[in-house]
From Swiss-Prot:
GO molecular function, a single term: L-malate dehydrogenase (NAD+) activity
Descriptive protein name: Malate dehydrogenase
Taxonomic source organism: Rickettsia felis (strain ATCC VR-1525 / URRWXCal2) (Rickettsia azadi)
Binding site for NAD(+): G11, S12, G13, N14, I15, G16, D35, N97, I120, T121, N122
Catalytic class of the enzyme: oxidoreductase
Task of the protein: Catalyzes the reversible oxidation of malate to oxaloacetate.
Length: 314
């Protein structure tokens, strides 16, 4: 009998709990739910296992406060850290969450050095860099959840604008996972037709698309302002699951993620959101899009923002 993959979730808050539920429903593997708060991962694990009996899932879920339980993990998703709250930007979280990420990285290095690691903790582009450098894992096995989520928001707003199914929309968002991200209308389509062509057909306007791009950039902040006590968790969890599944099932799927760049897009030694192919080796290839001068300028501005943020912790 084939052994289930072992998936460890570091952080058992809203995203961690949602991740565990989705993994169980999709039967992706057995789960270790870790948190420093005593009782929280254990309680959620028991609740989720009981929910699994209704769904007919035999996935095993263990709640723990001991890092040793992540030993031998095939994949790890990290959500540990302070979430955003109203008035707090992703960047304000940097000093506290850097300390948390360093501790997580040490334990990943110790107990699961062969794992594929997905980081969700904000500020994302810096946290995933810290994970890489502190853990010593190969860069193709450490990525950040960014573009899949940003594209999902762009997809929704475009579907609403054109009054079509979200399944007809395919969008691309590059750059840092922050307010300077770069939603690319030229590389976004409705049933294969690029957005600029649809504008020429009179189905929308440049003004409307610019509003949608601005809303996409502030997508996380919009939810933080509405919730008042936290940040988004359903969509971030669903985005990470898509990345996890591409790895576990060797799908060789193109997804936009925060990936480590070594010259691609003219960027070195930095994590930035770009399209990558994900399969059983982790990051198989970085896909380099041909950008116009204007698009490249926006991308470079976003990259500069990531660099400045990273400089504050170096």
């Amino acid at each position: 009998m084939k052994k289930n993959p072992k998936i460890s979730l570091i952080g058992s808050g809203n995203i961690g709990g949602t991740l565990a539920h989705l993994i169980s429903l999709r039967n992706l593997g057995d789960i270790v739910l870790f948190d420093v708060a005593e009782g929280v991962p254990q309680g959620k694990a028991l609740d989720l296992m009981q929910a699994g009996t209704i769904a007919g899932s035999d996935i095993k879920i263990k709640g723990t406060n001991d890092y040793k339980d992540i030993e031998g993990s095939d994949a790890i998703i990290i959500t540990a850290g302070l979430p955003r709250k109203p008035g707090i930007s992703r960047d304000d979280l940097i000093s506290i969450n850097t300390g948390i990420m360093k501790n997580v990285a040490e334990n990943v290095k110790k107990y699961a050095p062969d794992a594929f690691v997905i980081v969700i903790t904000n500020p994302l582009d810096v946290m995933v860099y810290v994970m890489l450098k502190e853990s010593g894992l190969p860069h193709n096995k450490v990525i950040g959840m960014a573009g899949v989520l940003d594209s999902s928001r762009f997809n929704l707003f475009l579907a609403e604008e054109f009054k079509v199914s979200v399944s007809n929309v395919n969008s691309t968002v590059l750059g840092g996972h922050g307010d300077a991200m770069v939603p690319l209308a030229r590389y976004s389509t409705i049933s294969g037709v690029p957005i600029p062509d649809l504008i020429k057909m009179g189905l929308s306007s440049n003004k409307n698309i610019e509003k949608i791009i601005d809303r996409t950039r502030n997508g996380g902040g919009e939810i933080v302002a509405l919730l008042k006590t936290g940040s988004a968790y359903y969509a971030p969890a669903a985005s990470a699951i898509e990345m996890l599944e591409a790895y576990l099932k060797d799908k060789r799927q193109i997804l936009t993620c925060a990936a480590y760049l070594q010259g691609e897009y003219g960027v070195n030694d930095l994590y930035v959101g770009v399209p990558i192919i994900i399969g059983k080796e982790g990051v198989i290839k970085v896909v380099e899009l041909q950008l116009t001068k204007e698009e490249k300028a926006l991308f470079d501005k976003s990259v500069e923002g990531v660099k400045k943020l990273l400089d504050t912790i170096k």
